[in-house]
Amino acid sequence: MQVSVESTQGLERKLTVTIAAEAFDKEYNSRVHHLAKTQRVDGFRPGKVPTSVVTKRFGAGIFQEVAGELMQRNFSEAVMAEKLNLAARPNFEPQAREKGQDFTFTATFEVYPEVTLSPLEALSIEKDSAEVTDADLDKMIETLRKQHAEWNAVEREAANDDQVTLDFEGSIDGEVFEGGKAEGFDIVLGSGKMIPGFEAGIVGHAAGSEFTIDVNFPEDYHAEQLKGKAVQFAIKLTKVEEQILPEITPEFVQKFGVENGELETLKHDIKQNMVRELSQALKNSAKDKVLNALVENNEIEIPKALVEDEIVVLRKQAMERYAKEMDPENLPELPAELFKEQAEKRVKVGFLLGEVINVNELTVDQEKVAALIESAASAYDNPAEVIAYYKNNKEMMQNMENVALEEQAVDFIIEKAKVTEVNKSFDEVMNKVVA
């Protein structure tokens, strides 16, 4: 076997392998003789079919079979001999061959990049810091009251925080567009659920009024055909309701699982949840900033095949999210280009974090794994049952170990990098998570 390796472009390699004629013909002839003994052919006794007949009838198929197996086998040997680290499946191309000639094929594929990290000490990272204050807790209680509010119809002009019921029909350049019409639609004014300007255009109008609103779809709107377009909505306002908040009584408190009905117990439970959510949000924020700094400070080539695989994953996740909120028939087109930048970043992060782990010989901290499992379980009614489920599920334990090792790598980078803490409010941190 003769092997040569050529670097074609970026991480792409072209491997050319030549197999001696004797080796190919030996394998080919062996298959022919085997078929001559086992293949049933009309006009010949079993086991007495001439090899010339087998070659004439089945030669092309035998050639394909032998070529395929020899390419796979010799490619694997060549890759090991040349110490190539494949990032994706190869594309084989056999060359034409006459009997008695050597058999040559090429295999084109991408390899993993060689990663050299810049010093972690050179990274500059701003790390958010926040805490849950009494004001944050009071605001959360107020949010709970709003979630359980009643709505009473009023005979006045609509204002922010009112709930309105309306019919609307949108048109662009005088033409009604698909998905731009609804009847009996409820919206709380000021909630920001509609495109900018829509809710504000309803403020000041009373039930029974009909009017138009001129607004523009945002440039980043999910429907490609509507991005940045000017639209006019014809509105018929049928109802205006004001919000009536419930009093904080023992009965109200008991709605949230607090059996004793005491407000202080409810506040204690809510604060625990807020602290846990804030802690996770701060951890995620720090991780994002570490990974961004890591990518920005390290040039790295990445295999196109891995980016394409990641795009498939991201697109599938996006479609699943849309499917929960929209009619399947109205799901938007999601071209690969939408996910390319995010996919490239995720692939780069994988290589760079992997190198941090390898170079610094980081290993899974089982105490951290246990802490992560306990944290995940604490959100359930029966934490012990959830913990046991993790421990008895090999795949879930492996996933949690991967998460732990990744967090260890992030913590290691934070220890080495230049870190500046930035004080923020609970809302600033959590609203960023929602956004």
UniProtKB/Swiss-Prot annotation:
Record's keyword annotation contains Cell division: yes
Localisation: Cytoplasm
PROSITE patterns attached to this UniProt entry: FKBP_PPIASE
EC number(s) reported in the record: 5.2.1.8
Catalytic activity: [protein]-peptidylproline (omega=180) = [protein]-peptidylproline (omega=0)
GO biological process: 'de novo' cotranslational protein folding; cell division; chaperone-mediated protein folding; protein transport; protein unfolding
GO molecular function, one term: protein folding chaperone
Any Pfam family: Trigger_C
A GO cellular-component term linked to this record: cytoplasm
Keyword Cytoplasm among UniProt keywords: yes
Annotated ranges, domain PPIase FKBP-type: 161-246
Entry comment, domain topic: Consists of 3 domains; the N-terminus binds the ribosome, the middle domain has PPIase activity, while the C-terminus has intrinsic chaperone activity on its own.
Family in the record: Belongs to the FKBP-type PPIase family. Tig subfamily.
Name of this chain's protein: Trigger factor
Upper lineage: Bacteria, Pseudomonadati, Pseudomonadota, Gammaproteobacteria, Alteromonadales
Gene that encodes it: tig
